Each structure stands twice: as structure tokens, then as C-alpha cells.
């Protein structure tokens, strides 16, 4: 289990309160699909994913990205119990969707980059470290069913 300090929790929740989940979520998933094109195979029903502009403008990518980032709201509310919080999503992604758990780590890293671009100077090294810790812990929780 990962322990978050009071300072880390404050850094995460402060930024979360200012985040445009729809915009950052769509951009995060879109960038994942552009930078790691093999991840597109899990989104066959999303329509046109033929180019970066098609991916980033795709309404299904944006909608699912929002859904993914919204689940981080659950992580933020339950930072001390991520394994339980993501148990059902872990089972879904493992048993039904057969998603490579490495993709969770990749998406987390893309999310951190997107946050940095959205928040600029406010995204200090301390804030980055806290968010990196969170996305890593969420990736581990989502991959739990695989072990």
C-alpha cells in the first residue's frame, strides 16, 4: 500500500479542484493513442483513429478520456485504499478487455505531462512528484487482478 503525506494529498487535491476533467481527460487518452499507437487496438469501435488530428478530435476518445480521468476523482477520494477502489475496474480490464497492465503506467505518465502543460509554473517539482506517485499507485491498483 502506498502512503501519501498530508503535503502530497494537498498538492494533488489542490490541482484536481482546478482541473478541466473533460479537456485533460480527452487530451490524455488522445495523446496515449497517438504516442503509443498499439494501444488503439482496444478502441476499435471508436471510429477514425487514422491520424493524430483524427484521434485528438474524436468525440469517443474525448468522452472515454473524461471517463478515465473522472475515475481519478475516486482515487483522490480514496488515496489510502486504491486497491479496493479500483478492484472492479482491474477485473474488467484484466478478464474482459485483456488490456496490457503496462498501458496503465503509460497513461499515467501521459497524464502527468498533460497536467504540466495545463498548469505551467503551478506544476512544481513537488506537485509533479505527488501526481507521479498517484498515477503509479493507480496503475498498480488497476493491474492488481493480473497478479
From Swiss-Prot:
Gene Ontology biological process: hydrogen peroxide catabolic process
Q: Function, please?
A: The epsilon chain is a beta-type chain of early mammalian embryonic hemoglobin.
The positions annotated for binding heme b are: 64, 93
Q: Which organism is it from?
A: Leontopithecus rosalia
Q: Which UniProt keywords apply?
A: Heme, Iron, Metal-binding, Oxygen transport, Phosphoprotein, Transport
At which residues is Phosphoserine found? 14, 51
CDD domains named among the record's database cross-references: Hb-beta-like
Query: What residue stretches are annotated with the Globin domain?
Result: 3-147
Q: What is this protein called?
A: Hemoglobin subunit epsilon
Q: What is the lineage of its organism?
A: Eukaryota, Metazoa, Chordata, Craniata, Vertebrata
The gene designation is HBE1
Q: What InterPro entries does the record point to?
A: Globin, Globin-like_sf, Globin/Proto, Hemoglobin_b, Hemoglobin_oxygen_transport
Q: Which GO terms describe its molecular function?
A: haptoglobin binding; heme binding; hemoglobin alpha binding; metal ion binding; organic acid binding; oxygen binding; oxygen carrier activity; peroxidase activity
| Membrane-spanning intervals of the chain | none
Amino acid at each position: 500500500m502506498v502512503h501519501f503525506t498530508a503535503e502530497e494529498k494537498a498538492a494533488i487535491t489542490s490541482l484536481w479542484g482546478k482541473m478541466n476533467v473533460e479537456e485533460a481527460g480527452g487530451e490524455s487518452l488522445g495523446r496515449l493513442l497517438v504516442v503509443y499507437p498499439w494501444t488503439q487496438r482496444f478502441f476499435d469501435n471508436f471510429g477514425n483513429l487514422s491520424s493524430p488530428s483524427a484521434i485528438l478530435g474524436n468525440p469517443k476518445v474525448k468522452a472515454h478520456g473524461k471517463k478515465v480521468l473522472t475515475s481519478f476523482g475516486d482515487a483522490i477520494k480514496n488515496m489510502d485504499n486504491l486497491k479496493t477502489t479500483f478492484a472492479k475496474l482491474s477485473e474488467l480490464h484484466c478478464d474482459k478487455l485483456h488490456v496490457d497492465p503496462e498501458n496503465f503506467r503509460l497513461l499515467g505518465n501521459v497524464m502527468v505531462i498533460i497536467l504540466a502543460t495545463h498548469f505551467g509554473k503551478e506544476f512544481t517539482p513537488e506537485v509533479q512528484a505527488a501526481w507521479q506517485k498517484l498515477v503509479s499507485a493507480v496503475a498498480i491498483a488497476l493491474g492488481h487482478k493480473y497478479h
